[in-house]
Amino acid sequence: MENLPFPLKLLSASSLNTPSSTPWVLDIFLTLVFALGFFFLLLPYFSYLRCDNPPSPSPKKRKRHLVSQRPAGRRGRPRGRMKNHSLRACRECPRGLEETWDLLSQLQSLLGPHLEKGDFGQLSGPDPPGEVGKRTPDGASRSSHEPTEDAAPIVSPLASPDPRTKHPQDLASTPPPGPMTTSVSSLSASQPPEPSLLLEHPSPEPPALFPHPPRTPDPLACSPPPPKGFTPPPLRDSTLLTPSHCDSVALPLDTVPQSLSPREDLAASVPGISGLGGSNSQVSALSWSQETTKTWCVFNSSVQQDHLSRQRDTTMSPLLFQAQPLSHLEPESQPFISSTPQFWPTPMAQAEAQAHLQSSFPVLSPAFLSPMKNTGVACPASQNKVQALSLPETQHPERPLLKKQLEGGLALPSRVQKSQDVFSVSTPNLPQERLTSILPENFPVSPELWRQLEQHMGQRGRIQESLDLMQLQDELPGTSQAKGKPRPWQSSTSTGESSKEAQTVKFQLERDPCPHLGQILGETPQNLSRGMESFPGKVLGATSEESERNLRKPLRSDSGSDLLRRTERNHIENILKAHMSRKLGQTNEGLIPVSVRRSWLAVNQAFPVSNTHVKTSNLAAPKSRKACVNTAQVLSFLEPCTQQVLGAHIVRFWAKHRWGLPLRVLKPIQCFQLEKVSSLSLIQLAGPSSDTCESGAGSKVEVATFLGEPPMASLRKQVLTKPSVHMPERLQASSPACKQFQRAPRGIPSSNDHGSLKAPTAGQEGRWPSKPLTYSLTGSTQQSRSLGAQSSRAGETREAVPQPTVPLGTCMRANLQATSEDVRGFKAPGASKSSLLPRMSVSQDPRKLCLMEEAVSEFEPGKATKSETQPQVSATVVLLPDGQASVVPHASENLASQVPQGHLQSMPTGNMQASQELCDLMSARRSNMGHKEPRNPNCQGSCKSQSPMFPPTHKRENSRKPNLEKHEEMFQGLRTPQLTPGRKTEDTRQNEGVQLLPSKKQPPSISHFGENIKQFFQTIFSKKERKPAPVTAESQKTVKNRSCVYGSSAEAERLMTAVGQILEENMSLCHARHASKVNQQRQQFQAPVCGFPCNHRHPFYSEHSRMLSYAASSQQATLKNQSRPNRDRQIRDQ
């Protein structure tokens, strides 16, 4: 008391000396103190109002703001003095408040014992039930002659004193400087005084004071229930909840001296225990001290060791109760809490406590099923209902992180586990309950947190059960694996999910959209679906059991770290999922290399499958030692869609790898076989006998298509495996009109060094046809009978397949097709004005012939196009320059018998008989028809453009004879359905041979085709003055009814007329587009051979076929009236 201020000394002396102290003294003193504090509190606000500055929200924030703020410069008028005064007032205000709180604390420490024994006993709370007391009227007082030793304050053993304090009174009364603390004594003292309590029989154990340690987390204390009229004050820092069967603990006043040192042993305090319900059973002070000291030492030492380095930033574990002694907190953070006895919380207090606890995240472990008192004494272990206290949320900023850790299933920190072990030592005999009932029924948490805690505890229990099950399965290896049962670790990874859900991730190869997948692979197991139903966690091979057992070994080590391992496993699986999703995208784009499949095969070979696993999972390698990878079993963690796509990609990759090499090898073999055929004679090709034509046994080309093609469309190819020896038979077998060929050619032209045919001299013009069949344009529309019969079936719509060149044709187009049936018997008589045949190359590339035969293989009746208005003419007698046959695309089932003209010219040097007979046949036809061939100067360009696959043959032929180019252009014009009358009047005199009829629906042409035809038409119209006459649709239809009789010129003329009308339409349509290139082609027409220029035209393809209908409808009458009289007159003159 020597250090007290002067006013306080006077007050304390007067209060001690006077026998009866009235409450008004304390009221006056407190009123003055609060008035002073209120004045200092409002002083800054007044200064701010005068300075037009808004007041700060709270004293603490205002203090920090004002201390750090510097006076700003003047803004137009002098305000510096006012601000300085306000700053000074604000700085002095906290000091005044601190002094006020110090005075109050000292006053409370001085007046505490007197209030206990005197009139202010009600400030300390009601008497315990063990104390028998009566209330006396106001104004009664106690005698002041009692010894002062009895008035010493009582200190609870749990409230360990602060080392920096020197007086024991400050333990329970030292307030923090902040205004946020709560003073129970001050609040109760400011209220009207209540009747004091007097003891009729003063007991040596007066009511004890239990000062609560400030900021002590979760203190569990036991105290008697309060009286009915008592309402407990609210506590800010902690909410007191006590069990129902704890005894009240009271310390005798005479056992605790005033000079008690803060560091004295706790055993010096000898308390007395008073029973409930008025029972005054005494417990020996020594036994109580020993029990209290033992429990408190264990508790305090364990907590100090773990939390000594953490003061305000203590991390509260979600599953632990961490108590922090008073000595670990700074004096500034110690709230001023008056020493009040323990009490039972009313329902209102419980509701208030629950509201405080909802903001926190308390979790209790089974180690804290028994509550603890403030003094450190453990309550009986039979009390299973735990009521915990949680610190405010502001003291634990780490709680959201801990909550996330709980939700994510992360392992607890090591410090938390250590603390849990320490507390489990203090309560070793706890009852074992179910994991789902760990938390008490009345645990003050929100329903959401309750569910999360129950789920977390349930997961821990299931994981422990799964570990036990794993150990049991390890003792009996091979039983569950042999039967295909799920493995134990599935329950730990799936966390409660059934094995059926994991087994739904399957990939069945038999459900692949490709129906021939099983035929392609051939080695796919038949019962893959049964294997898919097996456990997806199995690894291939018998050694998979050992590897899986090795993977499960770490899981059996420690149950406390299973959550961490599970988290790591999930992380690995997530990485694998991301990797597989990235690879899946590459797989869909076709970027997976061949090494991926090799890695799969290496994995399968590394794990040999036993007989037992073959029965269950059907993963045994097939006979060809190519294991069928089950993606659902190896990659069970992937999504079903990802597994299905990946499996389909693997199957396609295998099929491609299996069939890619045979297809690459097969093509050279076919070319080699076709090379042998190129040396065969062309006698039968030029003019086969009726017997040969009728017997089509070996004429058809056998097309081999791979059975069980893989799903990839690129692998579906048709290959010619057995080409027949007789090319004409093979090309004409499917056509019944081949029987009309009964005449054999007679002439044989001479051959030069290069094996090409030489043109005969003027005397040999009789057996040389100047051009393959050139149709007369003077025939009537009623004279075409046989051709109509042949093309009558062209009404059946059939797709015209673009075909490559036919074998033995050196420069033949890929789409060359011959409609040669009725024209074979036509022979032109040996005229003196027959043009030379183009020089043909003998050499033939076998690789080119491969594509030719493939084209011929599809020349069957089922693939003819719809062409009712166009007759069909055989192309076997048409001679082509440089091996190009102006074959018209097939329009009916006669297309299979089309023979390209190149066969007749590309003969070997030693086989001249075929060409001789062919020349005789052509000359006879020319004599019967009496027409002259038109010439075509675009032969050379078209030959080069239309046959890019075979450039070397026709290039060297073009340099020798310019007539060859003209012959080619003439045959090119045969494909087009139009022909100008000017061309026919002048050029038909040269060569009127067999021309091929085009169809309206023709296969697509090459880009150079149209350009060559345009050039040809421009040259024709530049030299001619006549306009083309249109061909009526009637004339085209009547041509079908034309019958060709070998040797009759009348039928030949009629046939030529029909063909000429079609050619006129093409030429008239293309004339407008080729007017710019007329001068360039005139020179080619100026070089006649034997007095007759040679004109040939390339086939006219689909892009020009669309123009036929328009030309036929617009120029019917004009072309018909102009062309026929002139042509008939020319034919009669010859």
Curated annotation (Swiss-Prot):
Alphabetical UniProt keywords: Differentiation, Membrane, Spermatogenesis, Transmembrane, Transmembrane helix
Region (Disordered): 54-87, 115-243, 477-504, 524-561, 727-807, 928-1007, 1111-1134
Biased composition annotated in UniProt, kind: Basic and acidic residues: 132-148, 954-970, 1125-1134
Comp. bias intervals (Pro residues): 204-235
Location in or out of the cell: Membrane
Superkingdom of origin organism: Eukaryota
GO biological process: one example: spermatogenesis
Database matches in InterPro entries: SPATA31, SPATA31F3-like
GO cellular component: membrane
Transmembrane portions of the chain: 23-43
Biased composition (Polar residues): 489-504, 773-794, 937-948, 1111-1124
Bilayer topology: Single-pass membrane protein
Ranges of compositional bias, category Basic residues: 59-87
Compositional bias ranges of the Low complexity kind: 185-201
Function: May play a role in spermatogenesis.
Similarity comment text for this entry: Belongs to the SPATA31 family.
Record-given protein name: Spermatogenesis-associated protein 31C2
Natural source organism: Homo sapiens (Human)
